[in-house]
Amino acid sequence: MANLRQTPLTCSGHTRPVVHLAFSDITESGYYLISACKDGKPMLRQGDTGDWIGTFEGHKGAVWGVALNPQATRAASGAADFNAKVWDAIKGEEIHSFQHKHIVKSVNFSTDSNYLCTGSNEKLVRIYDLNKPDAAPQVFSGHKNGIRHVTFFNNNIALITCGDDKTLRVWDRNSGQEVKRLDFPAIPNSMEVSKDGNIITTTHSNIVTFWNSRELTKLCEYTAPTQMNSASLHPDCSIFVCGGEDLKMYKFDYATGTEIESFKGHFGPVHCVRFSPDGELYASGSEDGTLRLWQTTVGKTYGLWRCIEQTPAIQENTAVLNNKQEVPAN
């Protein structure tokens, strides 16, 4: 298995760079993947195959952030048209549109799907009650520059944000007050909270760092070969993957930081990386306008990947064919 070649599935359809992606939880019908693109058209796909399901049309500018609720019945998007939108992910119809005063960079649902949080270039975080969409949102202020990422945390009683002011902040939802903070030497390009909520993964420059989410203490930190724009930790915390400016996807051992393997498939820098909820694959989005799905265990039968176990005879014949010299045609 270790010597098999990684063959990613390429998901086309977007016409501009893919800048963000997100998976749903595992549902009765599988799990789903949504992508954000500068073409302004978020796309929904079957998560394990990459098959296109539909496109959410309505934004009038680049889409920077997307999210699916756990059940994959609702989608959200934030865009350069100063709007955050909530969609019926089954019908593809717009349900809500929340006007902002600047570009919306990040959106996320609460785990109960009743609330939407947004982060924007206004330097503000907002929480909207989706059962009372006309009500004024709860607003959190404190960042000195635009907000790149925001997510609910700790059973929805807290929020985590990171922004262009080189900080990561934890907020108490009830009081709206900042309760913890991290300062970075450079702008954090990505932020991910592990499925169990215990680990925060961040990237800045060529550094991938893992933090204890409760105390914001550093668990481990690794230096990558190039600037890393995004990283994702496997659900079982055994490995992590990351991608960045050199077009490659990297896989590392979480405990030691040892590079396990790297693959080149994209034709532009990698902007976003995420593991599927079952950990069997990871998805990447790139400047080249495509998403690619990569197997965590190369050669395993899963989704559209089919593995044929080779008998010794087949392996011997394959070796003969591989060593056979080609004869030029007359």
Predicted regions and their residues:
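A short beta-strand motif characteristic of beta-propeller blades
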Residues: 7-11, 51-56, 93-97, 134-140, ...
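WD40/WD-repeat beta-propeller blade N-cap
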Residues: 11-18, 57-63, 98-104, 140-147, ...
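Loop/turn segments within WD40 beta-propeller blades
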Residues: 22-30, 67-72, 108-113, 151-157, ...
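WD40-repeat beta-propellers
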Residues: 42-45, 84-87, 125-129, 150, ...
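Conserved strand-to-loop turn within each blade of WD40 beta-propeller repeats
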Residues: 36-39, 77-81, 118-122, 161-165, ...
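WD40/WD-repeat beta-propeller blade-loop signature
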Residues: 7, 17, 29, 52, ...
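Beta-strand-rich domains and repeat architectures in extracellular enzymes and scaffolds
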Residues: 11-40
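Terminal intrinsically disordered, low-complexity extensions flanking WD-repeat/beta-propeller proteins
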Residues: 259-262, 267-269, 277-280, 287-330
